[in-house]
Amino acid sequence: MDNKLTHFDNKGNAVMVDVSNKNETERIAIATGTVKASSETIELIKSGQIGKGDVLGVARVAGIMAMKNTSNLIPMCHPVMITGSSIDFEIDSEKNEIRITATSKVVHKTGVEMEALTGVSIAALTIYDMCKAVDKRMVIGDIHLVKKLGGKSGEFNF
C-alpha cells in the first residue's frame, strides 16, 4: 500500500492532484451504506405513507444528483463527466434497515470512488430528512467503498 498522501505538496499545502499525464480508462466504483429506522418507519416507507412522498424515489434522484456534483462538495475532487450512475435500495424488515448501493461509471483520468460515496451519503440523508417527522432515532452508517475497477491502482474489493 502506498502511504503517500497525494493531496499535499512538499510544503504540506493542499493541492488538487495533477492527472494530466494519466490515461483515460473506464472506471467503476460501488459504495454502500445503511439507514436503520424503527419498524414502523420501515413499513411507512414500504407502503408509501410518508407524508413528504415517495421516500426512495426522491432519495434515488438526490443520490444521482449528488454524484454529478461531488466536485462542488469535496474540495480536491476532480470534476468528471459521469457516464453512468445508479442508486439501489434493499429493505431488510428483519433488521429494520435500508441498504443503499451507489454505482458510478466514468471514462476519465481519475476514479469515481468519491462520487459513489457521496451518492450513498446524500441518499441516506434524504431518507432521514423525509422521515424525521416520524422517526428522529434513525441511524445512518456503514458507508464504505465496496468495489473499484480501473485506473493505475487496479481493482479493489472490500
Curated annotation (Swiss-Prot):
One MF annotation (Gene Ontology) recorded for this entry: cyclic pyranopterin monophosphate synthase activity
Keyword annotations: Lyase, Molybdenum cofactor biosynthesis
Cell division found in the keyword field: no
Disulfide bridges in this chain: none
Pfam families: MoaC
EC nos: 4.6.1.17
Binding site for substrate: 76-78, 114-115
Active site: 129
Domain of life of the organism encoding this protein: Bacteria
GO terms of biological process kind: Mo-molybdopterin cofactor biosynthetic process
Record field: catalytic activity: (8S)-3',8-cyclo-7,8-dihydroguanosine 5'-triphosphate = cyclic pyranopterin phosphate + diphosphate
Pathway: Cofactor biosynthesis; molybdopterin biosynthesis
Job of this protein: Catalyzes the conversion of (8S)-3',8-cyclo-7,8-dihydroguanosine 5'-triphosphate to cyclic pyranopterin monophosphate (cPMP).
Subunit comment: Homohexamer; trimer of dimers.
Family affiliation: Belongs to the MoaC family.
HAMAP family linked: MoaC_B
Name of the molecule in the record: Cyclic pyranopterin monophosphate synthase
